[in-house]
């Protein structure tokens, strides 16, 4: 992670996937010098930017949204999209993750067919459960600590229906996604607290009692269901 001047821009790079995150305030409508500097750095280091695959996703919850300024890379306009898949998760411009859930459910149903085929060979429940955990549960739980609590009841039921179907096929009750997600959130939060240099550690502030963490003030339901508030509520639970 690399923070730009003023703390308003942040570069995140995982392997060859690079994301520029900009916090625009007031009348700001572009990435400032951060994008220009990044393009120049790529040119200086003989790296080609594929403009056709470079997208811009604008997340703005204000009632009066500013008109986005068109970004130009080497005289080519960057396409503005309403959803984008980054590191295996589909983000939309309202952070509802319903599109991501639909994609997961579709792929999960395809893998249920494979589980049924495997069951038709009369293999042991141990092998069926191993297949489920490796190919289906891993799909349902990928990055879900970031988005599961933000889902609507309908989307949660769609995911849980896959778990219920797989439980019937394997003959073994598979773990509930809500319980599994809460356990993973606590595990992730513990990892953040144990790391002195983690960027999110400052979000966990201990109350004067020394036994509980201060819950951030959440003005929206969306913020309340995000990772940090959810993690603090679980850590404070008796």
Task: State what each model feature region is.
Residues 27, 36, 40, 48-82:
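Short, conserved micro-motifs composed of acidic
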Residues 42, 56, 136, 166, ...:
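Hydrophobic, well-ordered secondary-structure elements that form the walls
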Residues 75-145:
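Basic, alpha-helical interaction scaffolds
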């Amino acid at each position: 992670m690399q923070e730009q001047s003023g703390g308003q821009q942040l570069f995140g790079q995982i392997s060859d996937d690079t994301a520029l995150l900009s916090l625009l305030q007031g009348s700001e409508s572009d990435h400032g010098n951060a994008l220009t500097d990044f393009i120049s750095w790529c040119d200086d280091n003989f790296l080609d930017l594929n403009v056709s695959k470079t997208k811009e996703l604008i997340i703005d919850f204000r009632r009066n949204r500013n008109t986005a300024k068109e970004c130009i890379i080497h005289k080519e306009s960057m396409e503005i999209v309403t959803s984008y898949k980054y590191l295996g998760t589909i983000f939309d411009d309202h952070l509802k993750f319903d599109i991501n859930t639909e994609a997961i459910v579709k792929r999960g149903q395809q893998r249920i067919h494979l589980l049924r085929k495997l069951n038709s060979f009369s293999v042991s429940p141990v092998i069926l459960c191993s297949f489920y955990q490796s190919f289906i549960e891993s799909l349902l739980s990928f990055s879900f600590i970031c988005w599961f609590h933000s889902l609507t009841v309908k989307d949660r039921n769609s995911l849980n229906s896959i778990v219920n179907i797989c439980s019937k096929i394997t003959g073994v009750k598979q773990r509930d996604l809500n319980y599994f997600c809460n356990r993973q959130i606590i595990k992730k939060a513990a990892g953040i607290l144990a790391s002195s240099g983690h960027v999110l550690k400052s979000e966990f502030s201990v109350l004067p009692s020394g036994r509980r963490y201060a819950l951030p003030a959440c003005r929206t339901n969306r913020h309340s269901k995000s990772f940090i508030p959810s993690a603090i509520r679980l850590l404070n639970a008796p």
